[in-house]
Amino acid sequence: MSNNPKIPFSFKKLTSRNYSVLKDELLELYLQAFTTGEYAQYVSRKDASWKLDEIQSIGSGVAAMLHGKPAGALMGIPFALDTDFPAENHPHIPMEKTVYIAELMVHEDVRGQGIASALIHEFLENEKEKGITDAVIRVWIENIPAVKLYEKLGFRRIEEITQTKFKSETETFEMKKIYLHKKLK
């Protein structure tokens, strides 16, 4: 169970087996989190499925389970695999000992209940056991609730990039994103 009294959830590591069992629900969670609401962008079901499979194949993750279903999930990869980050500008970040939080998603019905914070904490504790010393996350600068959460959890802004994303299947827009870094203790 979580330490947060607001909502009784448990954690499940996203092992290959657990991921296979939860894949369809994680895909629905991903699509709900990233393609609906105020911060929506267009991502096809096929592309989302491929992305989750790719992250799972090279990274690790954890799900927050509520009533037997994933209410949230966090998936990370080795930071050295994030080709968008201008590593040459940040030689103080040890790329081989840094995890990149590639996806963090919480179902809209349970946002604000401490799930994202708990997922980040649980995931980073697991990563520290593997010798990871740093963590980085990237977020759309306009997603103020997420930016505030990450900063509250000790992440500090280190870089900005602009990415072209899809608003619809054919219409694009420019999304300014920020990278935030945290030294793990």
Regions found by a protein language model. Give the residues of each.
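Glycine-rich acetyl-CoA-binding "A-motif" of GNAT/NAT acetyltransferases
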Residues: 69-72, 145
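Conserved N-terminal entry element of GNAT/NAT acetyltransferase domains
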Residues: 1-28, 32, 185
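Active-site rim helix/loop that mediates acceptor-substrate recognition in acyltransferases
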Residues: 38-66, 75, 81
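Conserved beta-strand-loop-alpha-helix junction that forms the acyl-donor binding cleft
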Residues: 111, 137-147, 163-168, 173
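Conserved active-site tyrosine of GNAT-family acetyltransferases
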Residues: 30, 150, 155
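Conserved GNAT acetyl-CoA-binding A-motif
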Residues: 127-139
